[in-house]
Structure formats: structure tokens, C-alpha cells
Amino acid sequence: QDNGFKVRDEMGGAVDPDGLKEIEAAIPDLVEDIKFLSYEDADLQRLIEKFDASIDYIKHIKKLIDLGPIKEAGLMVVVDSMWGNGAGWFTRLLKGGRTKVLEIHNERNPSFPEMLRPEPIPPNVDAGLKFSKANQGDVVLILDGDADRVGIGDEKGNFVNQLRVFGLLAYYMLEVRGERGPIVKTLSTTKMLNKLGEIYDVPVHETGVGFKYVAPKMIETDALIGGEESGGYAFRGNVPERDGILGGLYFLDMMVKMKMKPTELLDVLFSKVGEHYYDRIDTLFSGDREEIRNTVKNAKPETIGGLKVTSLNDTDGFQYYLEDGGWLLIRFSGTEPKLRVYCETTHGDLVQAILEDGLRIAGLK
């Protein structure tokens, strides 16, 4: 159920929804109509080109970021590669200096033991955080299975949620590197980005959920940074696609340039935009999808979690904007029988109440 493949366009970014529909329309309906060719036969017919992409990738990375100061910073960097293809990359890129890199789950293993899924979100991150705490890590970099997403753990062994990481990376681009350009965000990620946009006078573009919406908008606007709620971030100068290795290196560079640990970086961010809290619930459902959708559509709540609802956005699911500048989003998974309920608020004590109200609105509580 988890197998599949990704399609990328000539820019290296996700194909937009219209392009995906064209590709899907060309897929034969019957398996017997598909032509098969073994790897061995394809290799003999010279239909497969083999090359080492790492050489050009490393050259490209070094054009985007000076690794020297990170190597000499004397950091203890813990990396959880989650048994995926990000294994060994940070060790390779940062060797030869005072900074040490300790890796766990750094062998490729498609069964992904010790975790529910190779995603850099709780509870999958717990092993890396525990290992870092035991080894006095300054930061934890957690890559997903294909290393296009990155999660962060702080120097105390606590997880830094993806919305806060997005806010920090945008702040780094705008303040530390002094760059300017649009920010592209999915509607399921943080409003801290909108506040940073106002402070630094850069436009913020909001899209539907998924990089199939983010990548085209980044190309269209020549965006400085783009990202989504799941921990995927893309940067100008790179392909318009998520890159967990580059995101991790930029985070380390921010620590080095600002001479701060992750908790201190968050304090700086919050001094600019205020403290924001986030959580999400994924719940399986067995009923009719349209029935649940209509239940949400007809709910029209006046308050959620005790906060007044100010407006509704139904671009991709149902997003209720709240009086504190926060939001609740209710939307279906595109691939599974799951309802996702997300929220962000400036009131840490209201997060669970907001999420529970979201389930009630959907008729699932």
C-alpha cells in the first residue's frame, strides 16, 4: 500500500495537478496492456544510464552554502537517517573539522524497523531524540526515507515542530542571509510566515496542500523559500523541490552564524512574531466521505476551542480562521481513508480543545 513513484518536471519540481491528470490518463486500464522489460534486458539494450549524481550535487551545495564555518564550529550533530537514502550525507559533507556527526539508522533498510513510518514527525523521531540526549547533541537532524524532508530536535532532546522550523528557515533567509523574495506556503502551515512577510516586506503566497501546488508557484514567483506542513522545504537557487539535506545544512548555518542553540533561535523568532503552537490529529473513518464532507460544510461553528471564528477558507478542505490569528483545518487525505485535523494558535492551552472541536465538527466525536 505504500509503494509508488514520483514524477518530476524539467525543472526538477513536482508536476502540477493538470500535468498529473495527463499522465494518469495515459496509464493503461489493464495490467496485460502494459509492456514489461526486466532490468537486465533493459541494461543490455542500453536503455539505462548509470551515473554518480553525488559529485555534481556536492559541487552545487558548496555554491549555495559555505560549509567551512559549520565544520569548524565544534558542534555535536546527531543525524537520524531513518534507514533511508540520506544515510551518510551529513558525515560526508561535514567531515574534516571540529564538528562531529553521529548517525543512527544509517543503513538502508526498506522495512524501516523501530518506527511506524520513515517520517520526521512524532513518534518516529523519538529514537533520534533519545540518542541525542544521551550523547549531548547540540541539534538533531532527522531525514525521512528519501531525504526530501527534515525534522529538527533541539539541544535538550525535544522535537521542534515543522511549522516552527519553517518559520526559522524563513527568518534565516530574510534576516541572517539578507535575501529577499516571495514565500510560498501551503494553507496547512504556519501564519508566522505571514507575519515575517509583513516585517520584511515580502509577499506570501498560500497554496493548496502538497508540493504539486508549491513548486509551480515557486517557479512563477521566483520564490525565496517554499514549504509545507510535513517538513519539506525548498529554496531559491536549488530545484523547486524539497531537499532535507540542504534544509539541514541551512539550519546548522543559522546556528553557527547566530551563535545559538535551537531553543535560543526559537526565542529570537518568537520575539518577532509571537509564540505559536501547533498539533494535528489523523483519524481513520469507515463512513461515506461525502457524508462527512457535508457534515463539515453544514456545521458553521461560531467558536472553536473557545475562540471566535472570523472566516472560512474552503480552497482545500475547510479552514476556519480564529480571532487570535490561528486556524483549524479539516481535510481528507488524498490517498487514505483518513481525516486530518490540524490547528495553529497563539494559545498553547487551547490546542487540544481546538482539535477536539474539529472532530466534533466532522461528526467523529
Question: What do the PLM-derived regions correspond to, one by one?
Answer:
Residues 143-145, 159-164, 239-243:
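Short glycine/threonine-rich catalytic loop with a Thr-x-Gly-x-Asp
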Residues 82-87, 147-148, 189-191, 347:
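Gly/Ser/Thr-rich loops at beta-strand to alpha-helix junctions
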Residues 15-59, 155-227, 234-235:
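Proline/glycine-rich low-complexity loops and linkers
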Residues 23, 61-62, 80, 125, ...:
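Buried hydrophobic positions in well-ordered alpha/beta secondary-structure cores of metabolic enzymes
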Residues 107-110, 145-149, 187-192, 212:
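Acidic, glycine-rich active-site loops and adjacent beta-strand->loop/helix elements
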Residues 1-10, 143-156:
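Active-site microenvironments of hydrolase-like enzyme catalytic domains
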Residues 3-132, 136:
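Gly/Ser/Thr-enriched, mixed-charge loops and adjacent short helices
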Residues 138-139, 175, 179-365:
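Phosphate-binding and adjacent anionic-ligand microenvironments
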